[in-house]
């Protein structure tokens, strides 16, 4: 899990898993994970009353989106009528038919930081082309290419990480990605945008 990975790389820090607005407002950084479908995650976020707290936190606090958490940062998704958080311009697209490749894209794949993002603090100590673990049928398409922090090839070249100011997000799961994933979490804990 994300919390276990963070506890492993930052044993002196307190890691809290919470669905309380107060915890989000008091934290010094935030991880937005997600599981399932973006419309369901957005619906649960709105129903929980956390949406406003999350949007306020995203203005200034380091924020790391993971998988659906990355997708939720964008404006909309082909997955359903739900709107995203619109913290980044762009949309979430479904992989088309890519025979003989299977959808969902599941397993290890290489991640290539973009030239403009290669020196981003979250990539520190991670070699370009390192393997990370993916499980997804959708990918983000950023409207602003300067937000693309990495790409991956799976039938097409798709965006596998994005960044802007205090926000960084990955389509892959760092917590399932062995040493490279733990290093990314360690870098996030130290990141001071």
Q: Would you name each region that the model predicts?
A:
Residues 1-62, 78, 91-96, 100, ...:
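N-terminal beta1-alpha1 cap of cysteine-dependent amidohydrolase-like domains
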Residues 37-39, 70-72, 139-141, 178:
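Glycine-rich nucleotide phosphate-binding loop and flanking beta-alpha elements
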Residues 62-64, 131:
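Proline-centered loop/turn at the N-terminus of a beta-strand
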Residues 65, 69:
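Gly/Ala-rich beta-loop-alpha elbow adjacent to hydrolase catalytic centers
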Residues 75-154:
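Pocket-forming structural segment of enzyme catalytic cores
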Residues 129, 139-193:
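C-terminal and late-domain segments of enzyme folds
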């Amino acid at each position: 899990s994300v919390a276990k990975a963070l506890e492993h790389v930052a044993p002196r820090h307190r890691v809290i898993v919470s669905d309380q607005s107060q915890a989000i407002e008091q934290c010094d950084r935030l991880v937005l994970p997600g599981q399932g479908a973006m419309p369901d995650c957005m619906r649960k976020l709105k129903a929980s009353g956390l949406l406003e707290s999350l949007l306020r936190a995203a203005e200034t606090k380091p924020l790391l989106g993971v998988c659906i958490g990355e997708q939720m940062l964008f404006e909309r998704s082909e997955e359903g009528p739900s709107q995203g958080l619109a913290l980044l311009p762009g949309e979430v697209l479904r992989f088309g038919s890519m025979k003989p490749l299977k959808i969902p894209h599941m397993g290890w794949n290489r991640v290539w930081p973009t030239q403009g993002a290669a020196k981003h603090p979250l990539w520190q100590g991670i070699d370009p082309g390192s393997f990370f673990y993916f499980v997804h049928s959708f990918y983000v398409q950023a409207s602003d290419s300067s937000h693309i922090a990495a790409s991956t090839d799976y039938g097409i070249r798709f965006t596998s990480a994005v960044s802007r100011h205090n926000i960084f997000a990955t389509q892959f799961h760092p917590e399932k990605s062995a040493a490279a994933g733990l290093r990314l979490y360690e870098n996030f804990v130290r990141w001071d945008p």
